């Protein structure tokens, strides 16, 4: 696609495109060499491994680092599918298509997110069962969460947690409500996409999987 754009062979709504990263949807008329083409042919999805200590946003009034400080200029117009907070890590999906973003974020589409979570203290069976039934805290109702202990000691516990929604700071809020602190939070999967061995601060292009 970038090669076609550099050769000025693509038009959107009659205007020649001279840079990548333009958001398009079904409402746009896209042409390649004066022939109409389906808009999804230009859809792009990237996987990015977000490090701790950066924001999922294009800019920050406090001048804190954002994920776009790690990405090349050609991806500066990409939009994120979901978010991770400043101190969370792991998989972020990026796309140039707002319809794809909405598809993955809408709760009714039920895309699973999987996290590895480190908490201070011990997580017992009672907590695991409570998560499985759904959790209510700070006047917010959270859907059932499947959690399992990966490893533990007297001081900490590593969990894998499977969620079907993406409420703001969901995992952190749940553990705060039972006086436990999350010290690491890493998303390893979102729907059909997995973090795999992608290194921190690195990205790769992926095929669209509905």
Where would I find each of the regions flagged by the language model?
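Basic, flexible Lys/Arg- and Gly-enriched helix-loop patches that mediate nucleic-acid binding at interfaces
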Residues: 2-210
């Amino acid at each position: 696609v970038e090669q076609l754009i550099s050769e000025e062979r693509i038009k959107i709504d009659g205007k020649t495109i001279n840079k990548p990263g333009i958001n398009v949807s079904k409402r746009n008329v896209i042409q390649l060499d004066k022939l109409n083409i389906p808009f999804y042919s230009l859809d792009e999805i990237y996987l990015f491994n977000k490090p701790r200590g950066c924001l999922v946003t294009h800019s920050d009034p406090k001048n804190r680092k954002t994920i776009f400080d790690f990405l090349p200029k050609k991806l500066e117009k990409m939009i994120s599918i979901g978010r991770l907070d400043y101190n969370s890590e792991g998989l972020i999906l990026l796309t140039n298509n707002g319809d794809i973003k909405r598809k993955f974020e809408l709760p009714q589409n039920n895309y699973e997110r999987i996290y590895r979570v480190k908490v201070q203290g011990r997580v017992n069976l009672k907590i695991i069962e409570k998560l499985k039934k759904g959790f209510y805290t700070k006047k917010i109702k959270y859907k059932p969460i499947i959690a399992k202990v990966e490893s533990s000691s007297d001081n900490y516990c590593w969990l894998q947690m499977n969620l079907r929604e993406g409420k703001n700071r969901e995992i952190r809020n749940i553990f705060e409500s039972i006086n436990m602190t999350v010290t690491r939070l890493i998303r390893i999967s979102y729907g059909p996409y997995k973090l795999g061995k992608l290194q921190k601060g690195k990205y790769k292009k992926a095929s669209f999987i509905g």
